Amino acid sequence: MKENIDKLLSNIAIMEPPLGLQDKLALARQENRKLTIKLGFDPTAPDLHLGHAVVLQKLKDFQDEGHRIVVIIGDFTAGIGDPTGRNKLRPPLTPEQINKNSQTYINQLAKVINIENIEIRKNSEWFNNMPFSNVIKLISKITLAQIMHRDDFKTRFESKAPVHLHEIIYPILQGYDSVMIDADIELGGTDQLFNNLVGRTLQEAYEKKGQIVITMPLLEGLDGIEKMSKSKNNYIGLTDNANDMYGKVMSIPDSVIINYLTLATDMEAEKQSAIVSQLELGLNPMKIKKDIAYNIVKRYHDDISAKEATEHFERVVQKRTPEEADHDVLILPKGSYITLLDLCSVALPAISRSELRRLIRSGAVRVDKSKEDDEIKNIEVIPGTLIWIGKRYKFRIGS
């Protein structure tokens, strides 16, 4: 069970309460039942993006462990507009927009999770016909002081910007979804922490067991600064074509490479760690970005599309000839020395060191056309030096 917990805890930003997952898992075993895992979306835009996929991947982790997955489509609350992170009123959507976006969301969920064994609920089920007396009863469970703890409301209030009453009740309505489905755990981005904690408070107010709140880090957008968002036009959509998806990943700043590696790819943790180590040793960030871009395109399209997108990027964007494209560039400290094994490991971080040793000892590694079979030999870092590893991999030390 420890390995399963490690997987479920991987990459999370905040869990409230801190040991809540372990307690919920123990309770589920005691009661011989699955946990109910909730993830909610307001269909405010037609496309999901890689930022949404960070949370969807965590949902898949729980799905893989056999738990009950409930996705809430906030078709009712989308008509209000989530004020999270807003410094002004979010415009509500029309019923037509909401219905259209809801369907595209459901289709796109299948790119990350298995939609055959999840429950999809719309919160209009319980809100459309809720008597007004029940609305009053619901909002009486939360105080204005609690609501005003939200940073976005507090900022707007202090700057005398308007805060509308329908925005104030939004977190309460979203939280009530957890009451209706008896959620054990709610997932979301860190920007949803307040809303999700309201759900926990409401469950307890209705004499139910409070849900655990797990939030995931927010993936930076293409600018490398603000969170990925369609409204900021800094996003990579799950439905982007392969060439656009690849090119957008290649455009990210070097400062967010590791976040994209850990949050947006489905590489094994061991491979991710190896790449991070090699990046620290001086592997060209361009090489890392290509690995990330390839993985992401393969994940949301297929392997052939990823290969074609790579070729398109090198031919059209980098304007490299086929011969130049054969040699990836390694950036290492000029004039320094590095062992042959470390050099090969920097060049090919995804290949294990034991496999690289085998290649070296078998005579499959050449440095400037000279066969090298001593893994501990120190190689001087000289710009322009060519390295061949096997028949497939060719590298050039950059200046």
UniProtKB/Swiss-Prot annotation:
Motif ('KMSKS' region): 227-231
Catalytic reactions of this protein: tRNA(Tyr) + L-tyrosine + ATP = L-tyrosyl-tRNA(Tyr) + AMP + diphosphate + H(+)
Enzyme Commission code(s) on record: 6.1.1.1
Localisation per UniProt entry: Cytoplasm
GO molecular function: ATP binding; RNA binding; tyrosine-tRNA ligase activity
Disulfide feature: none
EC top class, as a word: ligase
Motif interval(s): 'HIGH' region: 43-52
Pfam families associated with the record: S4 (PF01479), tRNA-synt_1b (PF00579)
Keywords noted in UniProt: Aminoacyl-tRNA synthetase, ATP-binding, Cytoplasm, Ligase, Nucleotide-binding, Protein biosynthesis, RNA-binding
Domain S4 RNA-binding: 338-398
Any GO CC annotation of this UniProt entry: cytosol
GO biological process: tyrosyl-tRNA aminoacylation
Organism superkingdom: Bacteria
Residues holding ATP: K230
UniProt family annotation: Belongs to the class-I aminoacyl-tRNA synthetase family. TyrS type 2 subfamily.
Subunit structure: Homodimer.
Purpose of the protein: Catalyzes the attachment of tyrosine to tRNA(Tyr) in a two-step reaction: tyrosine is first activated by ATP to form Tyr-AMP and then transferred to the acceptor end of tRNA(Tyr).
The protein's name: Tyrosine--tRNA ligase 2
Species annotation: Photorhabdus laumondii subsp. laumondii (strain DSM 15139 / CIP 105565 / TT01) (Photorhabdus luminescens subsp. laumondii)
